[in-house]
């Protein structure tokens, strides 16, 4: 009997050993799923259709927070276009739409980042994607320090080619809420981008720099999810191709408030972010330090526009399209809600198109 018991005891110890190993493996899996690990170096956390910055993410990207109604990222997020992008993409002509490369676990975004060298580390789980040097990305590769890494989506512009090599993206959020409680109209960011461009060009002229040396400034829109009905992308592209320069999503009369894309694909206001991007073409000969200096200059201009020119009061964007004018009013003190009305513009030229930005005193800024 003692020999039989002796034969059983090792098996019991073995079972306990197996159980201990399985428990440890379970703990490791739970540790791997921990938010702090999953979100290391990432920009936002997406869950249940909302976008929110944790305290350390907000401070990493936006600093300690501004004193004005809006906060502009202190550290620009580097963007790159990956392959041909996502098939579900559709976009307006006045800006680009950003979509996540891939989602997992209730919408956490996967990594698409630039490191200090400005070499892209793309989503390592996606088949066929490569590092900047041409080598296939190792599945286990990850930039562990997270010091200069932020996650974002892919750039898309319909079926058109994206001609820019790299983009410095400055997200803009309400200072107090840190997220947009409603979908802000693209008109506001279109006007901010145009005004920033005009001031950059003016500074270049004052410094005696030749024309054409100012990089492009674009309004950028970022959506975590797009639930578009079947055929909506084809309808959007065919409509834009049919109308050509006359097409303007800001004048889509089929919607009470023209959506981000003009075809109503954004169904949840909390799935949305926006900002301004500084784009450099592939042949741009600026050094990395020079590009960073231009990006810092652009951020200073954006902060000045938001804090000094616009301020906490309401502001207005007026878009003229031939005989029709759309006036959009933004109320920073009222949850960043906006209203939009159509009115006659007084011009019979259908190709006439202009954008104006006015502050609370109705002083034209653009």
UniProtKB/Swiss-Prot annotation:
Q: What is the lineage of its organism?
A: Viruses, Duplodnaviria, Heunggongvirae, Peploviricota, Herviviricetes
UniProt name for this protein: Uncharacterized protein ORFD
């Amino acid at each position: 009997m003692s020999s039989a018991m002796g034969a059983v005891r090792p098996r019991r110890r073995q079972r306990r050993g197996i159980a201990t190993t399985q428990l440890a493996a379970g703990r490791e899996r739970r540790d791997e799923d921990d938010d702090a690990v999953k979100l290391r170096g990432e920009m936002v956390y997406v869950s249940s259709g909302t976008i929110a910055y944790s305290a350390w993410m907000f401070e990493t990207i936006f600093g300690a927070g501004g004193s004005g109604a809006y906060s502009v990222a202190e550290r620009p997020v580097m963007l790159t276009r990956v392959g041909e992008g996502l098939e579900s993409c559709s976009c307006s002509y006045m800006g680009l739409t950003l979509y996540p490369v891939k989602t997992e676990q209730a919408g956490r975004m996967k990594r698409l980042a630039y490191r200090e060298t400005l070499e892209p580390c793309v989503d390592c789980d996606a088949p066929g994607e490569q590092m900047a040097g041409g080598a296939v990305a190792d599945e286990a590769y990850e930039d562990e320090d997270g010091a200069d890494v932020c996650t974002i989506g892919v750039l898309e512009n319909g079926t058109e080619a994206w001609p820019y090599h790299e983009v410095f993206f400055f997200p803009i959020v309400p200072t107090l809420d840190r997220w947009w409680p409603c979908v802000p109209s693209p008109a506001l960011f279109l006007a901010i981008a145009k005004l920033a461009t005009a001031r950059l060009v003016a500074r270049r002229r004052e410094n005696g720099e030749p024309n054409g040396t100012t990089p492009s400034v674009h309004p950028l829109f970022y959506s975590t999810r797009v639930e578009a009905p079947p055929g909506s992308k084809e309808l959007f592209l065919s409509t834009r191709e049919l109308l050509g320069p006359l097409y303007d999503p800001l004048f889509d009369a089929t919607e009470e408030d023209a959506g981000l894309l003009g075809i109503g694909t954004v169904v949840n206001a909390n799935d949305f972010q926006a900002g301004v991007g500084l784009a450099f073409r592939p042949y741009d000969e600026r050094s990395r330090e020079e590009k960073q200096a231009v990006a810092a200059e652009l951020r200073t201009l954006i902060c000045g526009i938001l804090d000094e020119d616009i301020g906490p009061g309401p502001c207005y964007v007026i878009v003229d399209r031939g005989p029709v004018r759309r006036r959009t009013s933004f109320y920073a003190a009222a949850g960043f809600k906006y209203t939009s009305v159509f009115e006659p513009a007084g011009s019979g030229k259908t190709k006439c198109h202009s954008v104006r930005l006015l502050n609370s005193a109705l002083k034209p800024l653009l």
